[in-house]
A protein has these predicted regions:
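Glycine-rich, N-terminal phosphate-binding loop and its surrounding beta-alpha-beta segment
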Residues: 42-65
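Active-site loop segments of alpha/beta catalytic cores
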Residues: 1-37, 49-51, 69-70, 75, ...
Length: 322
């Protein structure tokens, strides 16, 4: 990801497989002891490069906690202040659990990455998208209060994390794009997100963390906004949303990218799988890019089709690196 020569590119799936995909594969020969959510173990089974993700929830002191129970609960400052004591949990136990992975990462056995929740994602979770859209105009002080609290929480997390295991990279969960571009305007981004991003990214860079924003949809318009606040890259670059990674590389030579392999060709046979990798070959050769399914392998892909995809993926990770 640093645009340096490599022997091969990582053989990596950044997003876990759908639960329905795993259920289908159990009927096609995937060992039943490999359950949905066992990302590390399933990656090992397929011979993918191992990684361990730690998602630090704003609502529960568990990894990969769901947030749906808070969706839309906040409509005013009073609402927020009433639930605030239940937010921003203590993640000390989860962070202590990172220490064994620090050793594995140091020995080259795994890559550790952390996910923090972003300054569009979290207010939207609390308020829902429609309320948040109005709040930018009607209750700006509420949005700023939420994002200041979130910034303080995320900075505390980084300080704690650094004492247990400095990850290779950090993703920021946002999902603030759709198939026609960003869900908010650039002035809204500059007022309500950029000040908090700059402070968070500055600390991440002090820890030598690569920073990648996770946002679905069409990101072309959003990328320069993110780069202006110091973000290094984006994922997953969904092809069906119209993203063109080769164009992004021409526009932004230093942008790091992950994903962009069109998941909808994976069930179409070897020729289609290879054609999609050929589309990505210039991007792979440019550096700073790791190809991966652009958002979870869907249940329409059989176990054998996925094995074929992985075999060809491994091939291209070598040939495209030279």
């Amino acid at each position: 990801m640093n645009f340096q020569p490599v022997d091969r590119l990582p053989v990596w799936e950044w997003a876990m497989w759908w639960d329905k995909t795993i259920a289908r594969w159990h009927g096609e020969g995937l060992p039943r002891e490999l359950k949905f959510g066992q990302v590390f173990e399933i990656a090992q089974y397929f011979g993918l490069d191992p990684y361990q993700q730690f998602w630090f929830s704003t609502t529960q002191a568990t990894i990969e906690a769901t947030q749906h129970h808070t969706e839309g609960m906040v409509g005013s400052m009073d609402d927020y202040l009433s639930i605030r004591p239940k937010l921003y949990p203590d993640h000390s136990q989860a962070i202590a659990g990172m220490r064994p992975w620090a050793a594995r990462q140091a020995q080259g056995e795994a890559v550790v990455w952390v996910t923090l929740e972003g300054f569009f994602w979290f207010p939207r979770t609390l308020m829902d998208f429609e309320r948040l859209s109005y709040a930018y105009y009607d209750e700006p002080e509420l949005v700023h209060r939420i994002n200041q609290d979130l910034l303080d929480f995320n900075l505390r997390l980084l300080e704690q994390i650094a004492k247990s295991c400095v990850p290779t990279f950090m993703t920021i969960a946002e999902d603030m794009s759709y198939n026609n571009g960003p869900m908010i305007s650039q002035p809204t981004f500059e007022e309500f997100l950029a000040p908090y991003y700059r402070k968070l990214i500055a600390r991440a860079k002090e820890l030598n963390l690569l920073t990648i924003v996770d946002t679905d949809g069409e990101v072309t318009m959003l990328v320069p906004w993110l780069q202006a606040v110091g973000v290094d890259g984006v994922l997953p670059l969904e092809r069906q949303a119209g993203v063109d990674g080769n164009q992004l590389r021409r526009l932004h030579p230093n942008l790091r990218m992950v994903g962009h392999y069109n998941k909808l060709v994976m069930h179409q046979g070897e020729a289609a799988i290879r054609a999609e990798f050929e589309r990505l070959r210039p991007l792979m050769k440019s550096g700073g890019f790791i190809p991966s399914v652009d958002h979870q392998t869907p249940p329409g892909v059989s176990l054998e089709e996925y094995r074929l995809y992985v075999r060809i993926l491994k091939e291209y990770m070598v040939t495209a690196a030279h």
